[in-house]
Amino acid sequence: MLKNIHNFELYRYQILPINRAQLELFKNTEKSIEELLEKKNHYFIEAFNHLCSNSYLDDIGGIKKLIFKRIYPKEDFLSEDVNIFLMAKPKSLTMETDDFSSKEIQNWPRIHLIVINDKEKQILAVEKRTSAFPSTKNVIRKISERLNNILGLNNLNVHINPIYDKQVFWDFIADKSIKKIEFSLITPNMANISKALSDELKNMAKTSNTARTDIRLNAADGTSLIIERDNSYINDLVEYGSQGGGTIRVQTEGVRKFTDINKGITTMSCDSLTLESNNPKNIIDIINYILGEK
């Protein structure tokens, strides 16, 4: 069998409660936020399964329908750290026939979505295939909206951000006059990446029911920000953001627009035999190696 290579970009998802104080407003059976957070990954995959079983109903704002299919594990009730889905949307093609006429057909180019649902990893690998979707960020916007419509019923919301090398930030600001930096950080609930943030920042976000914390650094008129690698506070914010914890935007001298630093998303490749096997768990090893995680 010919092995096709599929290329992916890596994102981190974090699942947060919408309201930490009033569980009774939702349909939850959980008695506390702690109980809800313990089951958040179950609800996340349940939301994906709902998309698969209800694709025929998909309709958001009159836009084109999306369809989803689960390919691993085969049974919905199985709980696995690796979950693989297909996602497709229709495109109209014009075919010229042998009687010199034309007819419209529906083409459904698809991509793979790999979900690593370990609560200490929470990775979403999105296949890059421009014939199906213009970018992986476009895919993230579409699935985030649909997943949150479902998760919201259980007082949950998912935030999905790209993973990239923090060196991208330092390379970008090198030898530039920096006027503003904006950090937009998701309230952390994953120990392995939130260790970069101070306890004060984490506690403030959680106790105030904050989903996203915005930190803005603005230089005074006629001056520039001083951003050094040995500034542990800045380093921690960059570290957390680059691991999928949020977004970073930078404005340089003489440029009106901000530059998004979360470009150059971390990539991985996987062959079709691995994706379609009965035990694709070595995908976790591939991702761990790329991200330098255990």
Residues covered by each model-derived region:
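Terminal interaction module
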Residues: 1-92, 133-294
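Long, hydrophobic/aromatic-enriched structural stretches that serve as scaffold segments
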Residues: 72-127, 132
